[in-house]
Amino acid sequence: MTDKVIENNQVIIMGKIVSDFEFSHEIFGEGFYMVDVEVARLSDSYDIIPLMVSERLLDVEEDYKGAYVCVSGQFRSYNRHEERKNRLILSVFAREIEFVEELEESSKTTQIYLDGYICKEPVYRKTPLGREIADVLLAVNRPYGKSDYIPCICWGRNARFAGGFNVGERCEIWGRIQSREYMKKIGEDQLEKRIAYEVSVSKLELVEE
């Protein structure tokens, strides 16, 4: 059962550690820490992806900034309560970490596979420049009755396809994790820069159950 659940949420990221470790929480005496990994895109830009690491995987007292890593794990979410609202916080939960000398130009720096359920009516729209986009929120089951809620963004014909999905349908998604900056209105006239994380979908299929 547990192995099957782990198979439905698989992530590989390759990139450079660019921050110190910051304590997140402790479970049964095991400490978990957050660290940022810079992951290159195909263009010249990059994404900063938050990584959650157990103190049993890495020495969290060490300074690893500048080190290249290959991480396999899962894309996880949890709700943080702030400003009388719940905010969805996303990070890659590391299961294995391997240090690498450097990253090859051709290597895929982030890959993700999800098998979950549509938990919100997909929103299909066109941008002012005519690009077709659909937003999909996927609930991916975890052991012990928990679920991760993963925002996914589809483009072009994938967006048209996803626009017809119904809540409760099972869907497989392949793609990459990306970050996106946006401005959040705080109070009447104040804006705060925030970063959202989502899966940019390259392929998706409905699963007949």
Where are these regions (language model features)?
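OB-fold and OB-like single-stranded nucleic-acid-recognition modules
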Residues: M1-E209
